[in-house]
A protein has these predicted regions:
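Short hydrophobic/glycine-rich mini-motifs in sensory/regulatory modules
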Residues: 126-132
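Short, positively charged and aromatic/hydrophobic N-terminal segments
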Residues: 1-10
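PAS-family sensory modules
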Residues: 11-51
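Short, compositionally biased low-complexity segments
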Residues: 10-22, 66-74, 131
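Structured interaction and signal-relay segments at domain junctions
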Residues: 42-109
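Cytosolic beta-strand hydrophobic patch enriched in CBS
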Residues: 55-56, 124-126
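A short beta-strand signature within small-molecule sensing/ligand-binding domains used
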Residues: 106, 115-125
């Protein structure tokens, strides 16, 4: 997923994946461990897709938070800054809602220009124990 987001800092401090996961009261230890395993193995996906990957979760307040980020090593990343812990802007929430409800990949209908590149957000909802 490639996003160019203007975002607010999450709690005004350096975000930590484990801390962000704790904002989900419905996530048990098994859910958190599964997500840690997921992001531990996703570098190869970023490399093969030539794309920045962002793991976006809804926190306990219903806001979408960037919980983890992976940059490809096969191409230059379009995202120079670390966005982990940032709140996703309202302008992308409708797309995220649709992606969370979908049963497969969800591709944005809007192309954006980032630098000299045209990018399209592609969302891949991940589910574990009935949670997205």
């Amino acid at each position: 997923m490639v996003c160019n987001l203007a975002i607010d800092a999450y709690y005004g401090c350096m975000a930590d994946f484990s801390h962000i996961l704790m904002t989900r009261p419905d996530f048990g230890d098994d859910d958190r461990e599964w997500l840690h395993q997921l992001v531990a193995d996703w570098q190869v996906i970023a490399d093969l897709s030539f794309a920045d990957l962002l793991l976006i979760l809804q926190n306990g307040e219903g806001k979408y938070i960037i919980a983890e980020q992976c940059r490809p090593s096969t191409v230059m990343s379009l995202r120079a800054e670390d966005v982990v812990g940032n709140v996703v802007p309202e302008s992308l929430c409708a797309e995220l809602d649709a992606a969370m409800d979908s049963e497969s990949l969800f591709r944005s209908s809007k192309l954006r220009t980032v630098g000299k590149a045209k990018v399209c957000n592609v969302y891949a909802p991940v589910r574990h124990n009935g949670k997205t």
